[in-house]
Amino acid sequence: MRRSHKFAAVLLVPLLAVACSGNPEPEPVQPEPAPQAPPPPPDDSAEREAAASRICDRASAAMESGDYATARQLLEQVLRDYPGTACAEAAPGEIDRARALEALTARIHFEFNLASISDEAAAILQRKAEALRTHTDVQLTIEGHCDERGSLEYNQALGMRRARAALQYLTSLGLDASRFRVVTFGEERPLASGSTEGAWRQNRRSEFVITAGDI
């Protein structure tokens, strides 16, 4: 009888050990699913190419009409807003060309009855000289113009003085005089019509025409 109690006690100890062994093991935590990648952006390359091409067409038209400043600004817009397009790839060279033509053909203006070079005109002529040093085969005709006040003969002479003043300034910057030709038109070719101070101011000028060389 004592042996049976001992056997029961032996069985009871493991059962108590199992019952008191602590909390059950926690279930493994399932990892959260990885976030899905966003869908790729729609392919708008054709639209970007078309938009850039339209701006380039406007730039080409501006170049053809001699509005080099507008052409340059349009090409810079393409380079800024539509990088990677065919038009943007070609833009840097065309911008350089437009900038050179803009400098070479920029006109200068004079005060009433004067042929002296103002500070503003000097800055324009200095940029012109830089372009001429880069494009060594370019030659220019310098035209002198006047407003309508004064006699025809007087304005012819004043126009020539203005053209020669521009020539003298350019040669003082080290450019060869053989690259230039001077001519006067007096009051015969006004830039602006009308007998107002604004029109007269625009007409007192020297124009620069490219007569040889490629840009």
Set out the residue ranges of the language-model regions.
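Periplasmic OmpA-like peptidoglycan-binding domain that tethers envelope proteins to the cell wall
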Residues: 143-215
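Periplasmic peptidoglycan-binding/tethering modules of Gram-negative envelope proteins
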Residues: 25-139, 212-215
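C-terminal motif of bacterial Sec signal peptides marking the signal peptidase cleavage site
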Residues: 16-19
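Bacterial N-terminal signal peptides that target proteins for export
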Residues: 1-10
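Residue-level signal for mature regions of secreted extracellular proteins and peptides
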Residues: 13-14, 49
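Short, conserved catalytic or interaction motifs in soluble domains
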Residues: 22
